[in-house]
């Protein structure tokens, strides 16, 4: 009877350890996929446009992207931020 109890306890312990290891590897895999996606977007310039204002030539505020909060700087002829 004691041997059966010990075997049962050991099996439950081993299964719980395995489940914990699976959970950690799943989190690691998701983090790796997210990091790979970010790096791929940075390298190939795919996905969302960059969230900053580029020095674009402009003649009016309509020529500038939404990230250029100051609009067109008419003195320099380029888009600018505040």
From Swiss-Prot:
Lineage of the species this protein comes from: Eukaryota, Metazoa, Spiralia, Lophotrochozoa, Mollusca
Transmembrane segment boundaries: none
List of residues that carry 4-hydroxyproline: 49-50
N-terminal signal peptide: 1-23
Tissues and organs where the protein is expressed, per its UniProt entry: Expressed by the venom duct.
Assigned GO CC terms: extracellular region
Proregion positions: 24-46
Keywords, sorted A to Z: Disulfide bond, Gamma-carboxyglutamic acid, Hydroxylation, Secreted, Signal, Toxin
Similarity comment: Belongs to the Pg turripeptide superfamily.
Residues bearing PTM 4-carboxyglutamate: 56
Keyword Signal: yes
Gene Ontology MF terms in the entry: toxin activity
Protein name: Turripeptide Gsp9.2
Keyword Transmembrane set for record: no
Subcellular location: Secreted
Cystine crosslinks: 53-68, 58-72, 64-79
InterPro entries, per the entry: Toxin_Pg (IPR026210)
Annotated source species: Gemmula speciosa (Splendid gem-turris)
Domain remarks: The cysteine framework is IX (C-C-C-C-C-C).
């Amino acid at each position: 009877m004691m041997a059966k109890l010990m075997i049962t306890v050991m099996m439950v312990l081993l299964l719980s350890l395995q489940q914990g290891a699976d959970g950690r590897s799943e989190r690691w895999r998701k983090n790796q996929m997210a990091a790979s996606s970010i790096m791929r977007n940075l390298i190939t310039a795919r996905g969302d446009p960059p969230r900053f204002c580029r020095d674009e030539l402009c003649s009016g505020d309509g020529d500038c992207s939404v990230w250029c909060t100051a609009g067109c700087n008419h003195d320099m002829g380029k888009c600018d931020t505040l």
